[in-house]
Amino acid sequence: AFTPTPLLNDTLAKEVMEHIIEPTIKGLIADGTPYQGVLYAGLMVTEEGPKLIEYNCRFGDPECQPLMTRLETDALELLLATAEGRLDKVKPKWSKHAALTVVMAAKGYPGSYEKGTEIKGVEEAAAIDGITVFHAGTRRENGKLLAQGGRVLNVTAMAPSVKEAQEKAYVAVSKIDW
């Protein structure tokens, strides 16, 4: 996952809002179930225009990690404004840098995968400037970090461009061993 995407321009954003998001919100209201909260729209951009794949009433994973890395506004402020119905009064501020997340998955994922394998090098990776390591499927046991799930770690890098963020993320990934 990475942000910003070169696909999103004003025309596409308007099309998504007019043909996907707004009809959904209006439909929920018409059904007597107005929604206030996080609404993640999984979209695919095709030659025929944007297509809705899924909605989730939560942040997307791993899509959320690079977005939150670029967000300069306090996320709690945005969530509180959402809950209080005043989100239109808050303008989020974003870093001009790009952010990219590499998902480190257990061998065999999404099928059967090994659990309990030791992970080393996370601290070394996280020490790289512009890197954040998000834990997904990990646990600590007897002072060791162990893989517990299919998607184990999300290594997120921020840099001036997506290409630089990708390079930085993979340098960090190379420090992690399990």
Give the location of each predicted region.
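Peripheral (often C-terminal) accessory segments that flank ATP-dependent C-N-forming ligase machineries
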Residues: 81-178
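Internal nucleotide-binding/catalytic subdomain
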Residues: 1-64
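Gly/Ser/Thr-rich active-site loops/lids in small-molecule metabolic enzymes
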Residues: 5-18, 61-81, 117-133, 176
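A sequence-level detector of short, solvent-exposed, charge-rich linear segments
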Residues: 35, 43, 71-74, 94, ...
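Glycine-rich phosphate/pyrophosphate-binding beta-alpha loops
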Residues: 56-67, 108-110, 139-140
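Alpha-helical context
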Residues: 4, 19-21, 51, 55, ...
